[in-house]
Amino acid sequence: MAVGKNKGLSKGGKKGVKKKIVDPFTRKDWYDVKAPSMFSKRQVGTTLVNRTQGTKIASEGLKGRVFEVSLADLQADTDAERSFRKFRLIAEYVQGRNVLCNFHGMDLTTDKLRWMVKKWQTLIEANIDVKTTDGYVLRVFCIGFTNKDSLSQRKTCYAQHTQVRAIRKKMCEIITRDVTNSELREVVNKLIPDSIAKDIEKACHGIYPLRDVCIRKVKVLKRPRFEISKLMELHGEGGGGKGEAGDKSERPEGYEPPVQESV
């Protein structure tokens, strides 16, 4: 008789025995996502993360997560002019069950961009890297379209190359002026009503009439060293960094406790 291995016995179990299925959500916790105080609605939503287990800490798994939220949801407004603007928020600190976020970028929805592009006009784009007073380096993208004059009988409204260059230069000048003299909080407050784009449209009217001028995208290229106190100021909670360094000891340097004679 040939001697061989019994595959059924080598596996050490009966055929057809299924492993116990454990629901992965039983090992997770819900955390509330908080937006900075620049927005009227602070409670953005909730996010899941695995509980702290061994060396894997739950708060470390949350830091760095990016949440994309519509401006209409952040401002609790049903205005259609706000719904196409998306803000990105990055988790920087976990306070209890709250995830405190900071501004991480802005973008327009694809359908809004496609709707703005039309025939018989000139599309003008500009982008520039600027630094805020509190150390954030932002790349700001601006877009605009030429508009037909009310007295013109032409079907088209194309701008000349010299006019396009002049408009692009004016866009960069206004963006640099408004961002370099402001902190990140003030820049976000300008992006919410899109006041920078309105200034550009007024300033460029003498060169060529424009329409649908807007800040298309904002990227955060570089951010300063993380400070909990500054993040708490963004969230309207002053003194958040208190107690981070601990209480100062009143004992002098080189202090040695006295030797006890009896225990």
Curated annotation (Swiss-Prot):
InterPro entries: Ribosomal_eS1, Ribosomal_eS1_CS, Ribosomal_eS1_euk. Pfam families: Ribosomal_S3Ae. It is found in: Cytoplasm. Residues 235-263 are annotated as: Disordered. Belongs to the eukaryotic ribosomal protein eS1 family. Component of the small ribosomal subunit. Mature ribosomes consist of a small (40S) and a large (60S) subunit. The 40S subunit contains about 33 different proteins and 1 molecule of RNA (18S). The 60S subunit contains about 49 different proteins and 3 molecules of RNA (28S, 5.8S and 5S). This is Small ribosomal subunit protein eS1. It comes from Bombyx mori (Silk moth).
